[in-house]
Regions:
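N-terminal catalytic cores of peptidoglycan-degrading enzymes
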Residues: 19-138
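Structural preference for beta-strand elements that scaffold enzyme active sites
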Residues: 76, 145-147, 181
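Solvent-exposed, acidic/flexible segments
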Residues: 70-72, 110, 141, 154-165
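Second-shell loop/turn segments in exported
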Residues: 64-66, 114-115, 150-159
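Basic/polar, cationic surfaces and motifs that engage anionic cell-wall
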Residues: 19-53, 154-237
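Cell-envelope and extracellular/periplasmic
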Residues: 82-83, 141-155
């Protein structure tokens, strides 16, 4: 009788373990499926032309020592806010191949600033520079960083933007195992933070611009949310 009870207990335990594993597996697959299905609008996607690519080669040669246009195994996601009122302004800025009206960084090269993603105030995510290519957005890190621009002003971004940032970060982390750090633009030149070990700048005269975007409160919320999601600590810098 004892043997029968013991066998029954073992059988039930195994079934419960299998059931729990199945549920966990389904949840994991479901989450991965949602990540793959993230809606990204390609309306403002820019396919770099020869002029932009040549200017980008000049920029990367000057600052990183190699004329490279491709973003391989990105290690950082940089969160920005545009410090502008609407999407149209930003799209018109990024569509130019040449840098215009930026006397603060014109010494660094002629290629225009850019971003990989733009998130509007309603939370809609737009692709801009294709992920295959480097974009000019953060001094010292463009060679290894993905840029996410949020329409609006530091620490005054919308709840819809916050939610879309979380979704996009999860999507990118799932896409690239190489990603180690997520930083706010205002943190880029803080050499006390772990991401700074990736800093690369050959031009010692290139002046670091002071940034406040996207705001400390916004970044703190992102990090708290990602911690709950279960990402590793090094993502929080």
């Amino acid at each position: 009788m004892k043997n029968i009870v013991l066998c029954l207990f073992i059988s039930i335990s195994i079934d419960l373990i299998a059931f729990n594993n199945e549920i966990s597996g389904n949840r994991s697959n479901s989450e991965k499926s949602k990540l793959k299905e993230l809606e990204i609008n390609n309306k403002y996607k820019i396919e770099p032309n020869d002029l932009r690519l040549n200017l980008l080669r000049e920029y990367t040669k000057k600052h990183y020592g190699e004329a490279c246009i491709y973003l391989n195994n990105p290690q950082i996601i940089v969160i920005h806010s545009t410090e502008t009122e609407n999407l149209e302004i930003v799209v018109n800025i990024f569509k130019n191949d040449l840098l215009i009206g930026r006397t603060d960084i014109e010494f660094g090269g002629e290629v225009n600033v850019g971003t990989h993603f733009i998130i509007d105030t309603n939370g809609e995510i737009y692709s801009n520079t294709p992920l295959d290519y480097i974009a000019r957005h953060t001094i010292g890190f463009n060679y290894t960083a993905i840029s996410v621009e949020n329409i609006g002003f530091a620490d005054n971004l919308t709840e819809e933007q916050f939610n879309s940032n979380i979704k996009l970060i999860k999507y990118l982390k799932n896409k690239y195992n190489s990603i180690k750090y997520i930083i706010g633009h205002y943190e880029y030149n803080n050499n006390s933070l772990p991401h700074f070990n990736l800093y690369k700048e050959l031009d010692i005269n290139y002046i670091h611009t002071i940034k406040i975007d996207p705001g400390t409160n916004f970044m703190n919320r992102i990090r708290n949310k990602l911690y709950n999601y279960g990402n590793s600590d090094n993502l929080f810098n």
